[in-house]
Regions:
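A short beta-loop-alpha structural element at the N-terminal edge
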Residues: 2-18
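Hydrophobic adenine-recognition pocket in adenosine-nucleotide-binding enzymes
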Residues: 8, 78, 111
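Acetyl-CoA-dependent GNAT
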Residues: 24-83, 98, 152
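Conserved acetyl-CoA-binding loop-helix of GNAT-fold acetyltransferases
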Residues: 78, 84-98, 120-124
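Conserved GNAT acetyl-CoA-binding A-motif
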Residues: 99-110
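Conserved beta-strand-loop-alpha-helix junction that forms the acyl-donor binding cleft
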Residues: 109-119, 135-142
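Conserved acetyl-CoA-binding loop of GNAT-fold acetyltransferases
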Residues: 123-133
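Terminal substrate-recognition subdomain of acyl/acetyltransferases
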Residues: 141-153
């Protein structure tokens, strides 16, 4: 296993949409995204997203947002064929190293309470719960809890 992360580029968007839509029931926004809409969004916003690779094969991606002087929000999705193998944990360690080089000292994330696998991973990675709020998952009528977490790098 050799996990690397790199800047996500336009050629990665088809993969991103496939993985994101497959994982959408675990996300705060469960709306299905189109490739065309994703391309427009990517060109318009130039997001700081990262492709996750294992031995040169794309297996998932990280998204970052709300960058401040020394903090940002993070989240990630892994292709279903690569889950349950410890790859996301290793990928987060790579992401943390990259963020440290960018002078990020604090990372935040938000996870839906029913996503127990992700919540437990975040606890093992050293994230602490900041708050829990009631939310309606976009694209559904589902009411659930959103857990905001923080980690010092």
């Amino acid at each position: 296993m050799t996990i690397t992360i790199r800047n996500l580029v336009e050629n990665d968007l088809e993969f991103l949409v496939e993985v994101r839509n497959e994982c959408r029931h675990f996300l705060h926004n469960a709306t299905e995204f189109s490739l065309e809409g994703c391309r427009d969004w990517f060109k318009r916003t130039n997001p700081r997203f990262y492709a996750i690779e294992n031995n040169g094969i794309r297996i998932g991606y990280f998204r970052t947002s709300e960058w401040q002087q020394d903090s940002c929000w993070v989240g990630g999705d892994l292709h279903r064929n690569y889950r349950g193998k410890g790859l996301m944990k290793a990928a987060y360690f790579e992401l943390f190293e990259k963020l440290k080089k960018l002078n990020v000292k604090t990372v935040f994330l938000s996870v839906l309470s029913f996503n127990e696998v992700a919540f437990n991973l975040y606890k093992r990675l050293g994230f602490q719960t900041l708050s829990i709020t009631d939310v309606q998952q976009s694209g559904t009528n589902k009411l659930t809890n959103s857990i905001q977490m923080v980690k010092e790098l």
